[in-house]
């Protein structure tokens, strides 16, 4: 099976998890469940990458700020 989508989790810039899946719906479902800064001290970054190389990023900060790109 080829893994074409990935969801990565970084806490304070350190990679803590990578999920690789072959279908878009599973990847999007996992990415939408990322809703806070988790166990990070300052911020958590979640990236969703698709087969074309496009990356969607959202970052949650301890102060409540959320940045999506």
Role assignments for model-derived ranges:
Residues 3-5, 21, 48:
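Intrinsically disordered, low-complexity segments enriched in Ser/Pro/Gly/Ala and basic residues
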Residues 1, 24-25, 55, 68:
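Detector for methionine-enriched segments
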Residues 1-16:
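Short aromatic-glycine-(Arg/Gly/Cys) micro-motifs in beta-strand/loop hairpins
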Residues 9, 20-43:
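A short, charged, amphipathic alpha-helix used as a generic interaction element across diverse proteins
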Residues 1-2, 26-29, 50:
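Short amphipathic alpha-helical surface micro-motifs
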Residues 16, 36-69:
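Short, mixed-charge low-complexity intrinsically disordered segments
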């Amino acid at each position: 099976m080829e893994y074409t989508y990935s969801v990565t989790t970084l806490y304070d810039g350190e990679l803590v998890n990578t999920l690789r899946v072959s279908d878009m719906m599973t990847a999007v479902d996992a990415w939408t469940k990322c809703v806070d800064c988790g166990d990070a001290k300052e911020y958590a970054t979640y990236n969703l990458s698709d087969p074309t190389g496009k990356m969607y990023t959202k970052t949650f900060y301890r102060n409540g700020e959320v940045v999506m790109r």
